[in-house]
């Protein structure tokens, strides 16, 4: 490796909004990173993920426009 072209790699403390902290290594010189979510509070990792129901949108679309298109096709 060439000397002098690589950034310094320092021990870093990551602090989450939920209060969880952990140690990692980073090129950020301050040695401190603040994040909003981490693996301890993110819904995907905690199992509290909300699954969106897109079927309701499709049914609503068909109720609005599907019936009109069906009437036009039947009228011909």
Curated annotation (Swiss-Prot):
Necessary cofactors: Zn(2+)
The residues the record assigns to binding Zn(2+) are 16, 18, 38, 41
Q: Name one GO cellular component term.
A: ribosome
Which InterPro entries does the record cross-reference, listed alphabetically? Ribosomal_bL28/bL31-like_sf (IPR034704), Ribosomal_bL31 (IPR002150), Ribosomal_bL31_A (IPR027491), Ribosomal_bL31_sf (IPR042105)
Q: Name one Pfam family in it.
A: Ribosomal_L31
Residue ranges annotated as coiled coil are none
SUPFAM superfamilies for this protein: L28p-like
Listed A to Z, the keywords are: Metal-binding, Ribonucleoprotein, Ribosomal protein, RNA-binding, rRNA-binding, Zinc
- In its keyword annotation, does this UniProt entry include Transmembrane? no
> In Gene Ontology terms, what is one molecular function of this protein?
structural constituent of ribosome
What binding partners and quaternary form does the record give?
A: Part of the 50S ribosomal subunit.
Name of the protein in question: Large ribosomal subunit protein bL31
Gene name per UniProt = rpmE
